[in-house]
Amino acid sequence: MHIVLEFFLVTFRVLWAFVLAAAKWFVRPKDKNVAGQVCLITGAGSGLGRLFALEFARRRAQLVLWDINPQSNEETADMVRDIYRQLQAEDSARRANSSADEEVLPCCNLQVYTYTCDVGKRESVYSTAERVRREVGDVYLLLNNAGVVSGHHLLECPDELIERTMMVNCHAHFWTTKAFLPKMMEMNHGHIVSVASSLGLFSTAGVEDYCASKFGVVGFHESLSHELKAADKDGIKTTLVCPYLVDTGMFRGCRIRKEIEPFLPPLKPDYCVKQAMRAILTDQPMICTPRLMYIVLCMKSILPFEAVVCMYRFLGADKCMYPFIAQRKQATNNNETKNGI
């Protein structure tokens, strides 16, 4: 009898979860305040990582930027400092013009910290994390964004590039999380964001290593989320970001069927990051951009494999990576010729 009652209770909770999820489509939850919180972003030197840094800077977060390229990382930091200076100038002007009863945001001593770190190397992650704890303090939000792509067919891809892709895109999530999660669990306070890809939910030809790494991120993130729930650490939030192809140059040359592309073009980086920020700031567990990706994921889960192949061929998604791979191969050959190899 006890299990029957529990079954009805679980059914009610499942239905209630659907109601709450549906309500969020009509009433957007209020964004949480990250002002003064330490937010660490990997791969901050370019692409989405840089845009994430600028968005968090506008929300007055203290930023810790990691990248393997110190020059590009400093360029991002300079952009962040410009935003901080603008915010402080606005605060000063508002404070000068405000009445005694008017509430004005406190002028925080906003700072940005840069660290050169190869997240594909475990020792580099752990040693840099120790420096962050010592020089900055405890990290509230960890945004795992760093990623690479080899751009080779499987049988033409050197083993070292396969290993590098797995290390940077997937294994780094384990190492950064192990470095910063203990303090979050101690405080029951924090947020872990995993930037994966739609190619971590469904795959295509020619990017076996990249797909495997992103599928790994999705599996890692989901298991971590369940582990935090099992440990009753409800104060630690997790968000999985799975965007469609983003126009950052990482997959330059990738093309689906030309008749379909106007309806499903590559995402603008700004749009992708703004959608992800909405999810992060409202503690949304997962976001796929565009929303059409949810439908594709559902169809992939229920349709026979041959039906999925037919859909891929119709959309031109079965060989969409081939032009990209050809461009990468041509660029490699040109560099070798230029260097006399």
UniProtKB/Swiss-Prot annotation:
GO molecular function, one term: all-trans-retinol dehydrogenase (NADP+) activity
Main location: membrane
Amino-acid positions noted as binding NADP(+) in the UniProt annotation, renumbered to this chain: 40-64
GO CC term (a single one): lipid droplet
The protein's Enzyme Commission number: 1.1.1.300
Active-site residues per Swiss-Prot or TrEMBL entry: Y210
Keywords: Endoplasmic reticulum, Membrane, Microsome, NADP, Oxidoreductase, Signal-anchor, Transmembrane, Transmembrane helix
UniProt key word Magnesium: no
Keyword Transmembrane helix: yes
Membrane topology designation: Single-pass membrane protein
Gene3D superfamilies tied to this protein: NAD(P)-binding Rossmann-like Domain
Binding site for substrate: S197
Residues spanning the membrane: 3-23
Pathway assigned in UniProt: Cofactor metabolism; retinol metabolism
Reaction catalysis annotation: all-trans-retinol + NADP(+) = all-trans-retinal + NADPH + H(+)
One Pfam family in the UniProt entry: adh_short
Localization per record: Microsome membrane; Endoplasmic reticulum membrane
Function: Retinol dehydrogenase with a clear preference for NADP. Converts all-trans-retinol to all-trans-retinal. Has no detectable activity towards 11-cis-retinol, 9-cis-retinol and 13-cis-retinol.
Entry similarity comment: Belongs to the short-chain dehydrogenases/reductases (SDR) family.
The name this protein goes by in its record: Retinol dehydrogenase 10-B
